[in-house]
Amino acid sequence: RYVRAMVVLVTGFVAVSMAGLTLAIAGVAGPLQVGVVGLALWAALLVLWGRAPVSGPARPDPRTWVLVAGLLVIAVSGAANVRPQGLYVLTNRDPGIYVAGGRWMAEHGNLVVDGGVEAVPGLDSLDGLVAAGAGQTETDGDPNRIQIQGAHLFPTVLAVGEWVAGDVGFGAAPAVVGALALAAFFWLALKLLPDWAALAATVALAVDFAWIYTVRGYLSGPTLLLVGFAAAALLLDAVASWPTRPTRLAVAGFVAATALTARVDAGVVILTVPVLVAVLVRRQGAGARTGRALGWWCLGAAGPAAVAAVDLSLRSPRYLSDLGSEA
């Protein structure tokens, strides 16, 4: 049941986030539009994954007390991290652009900020006050078309949080993502370790200061961890079900490539995943059809990769140009 719940939660998070980002790039994002498209994409991912149990070598089911304890750790960690309501984010430099972008998207449904809109009415009338924004640049020299720096998945998550629960949802979004990331870590650990060791590792991560700070104040980091842990767990199950259910590899590829819409440098890791897919499939022996398996994974990854490319080239070209010059 925990595995099925995680498949549902992860695919739901990815589906709604990708729907919101795609519609925001087009300038038509809103709670109704994102809800309809997100639910349709979510349903498609669940159908592609299917309800059949994972085949392949069986692992013993985790004991009930381990699952209960793990869920309790995740719940307590999430509750503790949600209490600050994003105050770490509001006082930290880099995530500030996520906050500004998320607010704009929630209220206007697009990723092009109108430079003529004052954040605080009457601000320009105050003598001696100069305002400047970091992480925002003009588009083609037009001060009324301002780019929001970077990839835009997390501003989308913040916007969805506001649509769902107003300011409370907006401020709670980092902690919710962090709780899902911790749950995905527990899910992956249960596949690789004895259940007691998976629980111990989850507890150690939940109380680690670096983890707590990352969840409360870094934003893109927990999103990558959520996608990464979940994609790895899905990949293990998809390979175990190969070639009976090839569409599971497509779902694993879709989730993994979503990382590209959160951070550009995630591409360095994503490029190595096809190698991992080939190695895992080849271990099944003769007749494993490695090339076909890679094709299914890449087919799933193509959609989010295309959205990430369009997002950067159309809605953050200055940032993309700066990355190119640094490279």
Where are these regions (language model features)?
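Membrane-interface alpha helices of multi-pass inner-membrane proteins
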Residues: 24, 188, 201-202, 248-264, ...
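Membrane-interface transmembrane helices that cradle and orient dolichyl/undecaprenyl
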Residues: 231-249, 278-285
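Membrane-embedded, hydrophobic transmembrane alpha-helices
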Residues: 1-64, 299-327
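Interfacial juxtamembrane loops and adjacent helix segments
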Residues: 103-162
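Short acidic/glycine- and proline-prone juxtamembrane loop motifs at membrane-interface regions
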Residues: 174, 210-224
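Transmembrane-helix signature of polytopic, membrane-embedded enzymes
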Residues: 4, 168, 185-207, 226, ...
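Hydrophobic alpha-helical membrane-interfacial segments at the cytosolic entry of transmembrane helices
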Residues: 67-73, 251-256, 270-274, 285-313, ...
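Transmembrane-helix motifs of polytopic, lipid-linked glycan transferases
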Residues: 43-50, 169-193, 230
